[in-house]
C-alpha cells in the first residue's frame, strides 16, 4: 500500500483512494485501523457504502472492519449518549426537514436513507443524539435487533 506523507494529497474516501492508487474496490487491500487485520472484500464494500472516512497512521491509509465498527459504535453510544427525540421534534430543533439531515445508523454507522427515516417517523421511534450527532437504525440493524429480542424472549419464557 502506498504511503501518503503530505496531508494535502490524501484522499479521505475509499473510492477516491482507489482512483488515486489506480485500482478498484475489488482489488484494494486495506487494513483495519483498530485491529490491523486486512478487510475482507465485503467489508471493503460496506465501508465504501457507509460513506466513512479513510484515516491515516504514519502516512498509511486505514479503514475499519465491520466487527470493529459495531464494537466502537456501541462504546460511542454508551459514552456519549445525550438524549432522544422523535422525528417531528428533531425537525423543529434543527429547522431542517428530516430528508435533508445526515443521520447515521447507531449500530453500523451507515447513513440512513429517506425510507429508513420515514420508518422511524411512522413507527414513532426516536432518534438518539450521540456525540453531538443524531442517529437511528438502518433497516438491517432494525430487523437484526428485533430478531435478537424475539429469540431472547423465547429463551426466558417458561
Curated annotation (Swiss-Prot):
Its main location: host cell. A motif (PDZ-binding domain) lies at residues 156-158. It comes from the Viruses. Transmembrane segments: none annotated. A zinc finger (unnamed) spans 32-68, 105-141. GO terms for molecular function: DNA binding; PDZ domain binding; zinc ion binding. InterPro entries: E6, E6_sf. It is found in: Host cytoplasm; Host nucleus. Belongs to the high risk human alphapapillomavirus family. The cancer-causing human papillomavirus E6 protein has a unique carboxy terminal PDZ domain containing substrate. This protein may be involved in the oncogenic potential of this virus (cervical neoplasia-associated virus). Belongs to the papillomaviridae E6 protein family. This is Protein E6. It comes from Human papillomavirus 39. The gene is E6.
Amino acid at each position: 500500500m502506498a504511503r501518503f506523507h503530505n496531508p494535502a494529497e490524501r484522499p479521505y474516501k475509499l473510492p477516491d483512494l482507489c482512483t488515486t492508487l489506480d485500482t478498484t474496490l475489488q482489488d484494494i487491500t486495506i487494513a483495519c485501523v483498530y485491529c490491523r487485520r486486512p478487510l475482507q472484500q465485503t467489508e471493503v464494500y460496506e465501508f465504501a457504502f457507509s460513506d466513512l472516512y479513510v484515516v491515516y497512521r504514519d502516512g498509511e491509509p486505514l479503514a475499519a472492519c465491520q466487527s470493529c465498527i459495531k464494537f466502537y459504535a456501541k462504546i460511542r453510544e454508551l459514552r456519549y449518549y445525550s438524549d432522544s427525540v422523535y422525528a417531528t421534534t428533531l425537525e423543529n430543533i434543527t429547522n431542517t426537514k428530516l430528508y435533508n439531515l445526515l443521520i447515521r445508523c447507531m449500530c453500523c454507522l451507515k447513513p440512513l436513507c429517506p425510507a429508513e427515516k420515514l420508518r422511524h417517523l411512522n413507527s414513532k421511534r426516536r432518534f438518539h443524539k450521540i456525540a453531538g450527532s443524531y442517529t437511528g437504525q438502518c433497516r438491517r440493524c432494525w430487523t437484526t435487533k428485533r430478531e435478537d429480542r424475539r429469540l431472547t424472549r423465547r429463551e426466558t419464557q417458561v
